[in-house]
Design a protein with these regions (language model features):
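Short beta-strand segments that buttress and anchor functional surface loops
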Residues: 15-18, 40
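Short glycine/proline-enriched loop/turn "hinge" motifs that connect secondary-structure elements
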Residues: 29-31
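Detector for glycine-centered tight turns/loop "hinges" at secondary-structure junctions
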Residues: 21-23, 45
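Short, hydrophobic/aromatic-rich segments at coil-to-beta transitions
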Residues: 8-15
């Protein structure tokens, strides 16, 4: 299993890659005129996992990662995030 960030047209997406090769998006960051909006995905309703207006993409990424959203989608405890950001697919 791997957790990694990938560039997208409008920001970055965080993915959990499962052992069977399937990828699940577990978070994302959008560039906006006001900064960066970040969401750590969940299977339920949790508005505290979404926040707007981060001044930097690194702060937005730290916010998403703080929730460990991959744990909810099949990740294992202690899973490390791949360093860097992959280019768009």
């Amino acid at each position: 299993m791997k957790v990694f960030w990938r560039e997208s047209k409008s920001g970055q997406h965080c993915f959990l890659e499962l052992d069977n090769g399937e990828s699940v998006r577990v978070g994302f960051i959008l560039r906006t005129p006001r900064g960066f909006d970040a969401v750590a995905q969940t299977r339920g309703y949790a508005p505290e996992r979404s926040r707007n207006g981060f001044p930097t993409i690194d702060e937005a990424r730290t916010f998403v990662e703080s929730f460990h959203p991959w744990d909810e989608f099949g990740g294992v405890a202690g899973l490390e995030i791949e360093p860097g950001v992959r280019s768009r697919a």
